[in-house]
Amino acid sequence: MDFQLTEEQQLIRNLTREIARKYIAPRAAEIDVEEQYPEDVFQVYREAGLLGLTIPKAYGGSNEGGGFLSLALAVEEVAKYCCASGLMLLLTALPTQPIVLGGTEEQKETYLPPIAKGEMKAAYGLTEPNAGSDAAAIQARAVKKNGSYVINGEKAFISGGSVADYVTIFAKTNPAARSRGISGFIVPKTSPGFSVARLDEKMGVRGVPTALLAFQDCTVPEENLLGGRENEGFKTVLGTLNSVRPIVAARGLGLAQGAMSYALSFAEKREAFGGPIANLQAIQFMFADMVIQIEAARLLTYQAAWLVDQGCFQKQHSHMLSVAKAFATETAVKVSSDALQVLGAQGYMRDHPLERHYRDARQLMIVEGTSQIHRVIISRALLDRDLVYP
């Protein structure tokens, strides 16, 4: 069992660590307060070549087989300081993976290189106002008409939806067939009938806008049907969500490390009861528990990303991706809460980053499958004997 990173992965981690410390850490609080997409951070990513880590090399990216672990490493480093900046990197994979998995050759050649080069941004549209965890219940409708598809419906809570040049969405082409009647579409922002209906006000992760997208007789050409085939989108939905779950886990892993490191530095300096509070066993045990959770989350996250890189992201391996996502994101919430507790009243104040880490962490247990949905996936794998213990 080899736990060594490749030379390229080590370079990516070191590069991203330097970028995070130099550019992102000083901007993190400001990004949260301004609630504006940090274009300067995006340009830093672009210049560093970090926008195509999961996009195959044949389409302008740098992925030759280890891209998801590379992206997880990069996101982990960034999320130590700013979870929103980590989400920006995730959004190079989430909207493009459906095209990688199910797109035509023409779609791959058209829509993947601009993301890898930083010439475009993209978003992913699955969730609707009345369809979240039950993805098969989406109500957006696409009807073929005169060589085009006319789309009607809404997509809710879409990360980066207001800054995206195109959105990869899913809609019903055969409503009676439920999940077997779902198709994917690539919708450029210039499409007639497409609009950003609302920007949401959020508790955390404020640097990446979240939008309600409206499709009112939105017309896209027939060649924008993902894969050129109707009613085959749901398999792509599942493959995409499974693929990016280790990246969400990496956001949690990085956030937890950042929160713990800040609290530890504080505890070593804060004097109480005759010395630094880091000398108190009660505080030491809190940090020991943080380390246990973080190191377990690290192994699960890296393993999950490695599985995706091996092509193991379909049903028989989905439970391991769910284990990683659920554990790492819940670790982020627990560790950020305990780190805030170490600071006491100071941790509750905006003078310190821990209140932001805590707000940001809470998002992670919801996106790309709630913690409860992941427990459903894991328990089903156990009952179906996909997950077998001797």
Q: Where are these predicted regions, by residue range?
A:
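Helix-loop "lid/cap" segments that line or gate small-molecule binding pockets
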Residues: 93-102
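Short Ser/Thr-interspersed hydrophobic loop/turn segments at strand-loop and sheet-helix junctions
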Residues: 49, 75-79, 171, 187-192, ...
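A short core secondary-structure module
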Residues: 147-148, 152-196
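A short, Trp-centered hydrophobic/proline-enriched beta-strand micro-motif
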Residues: 118-126
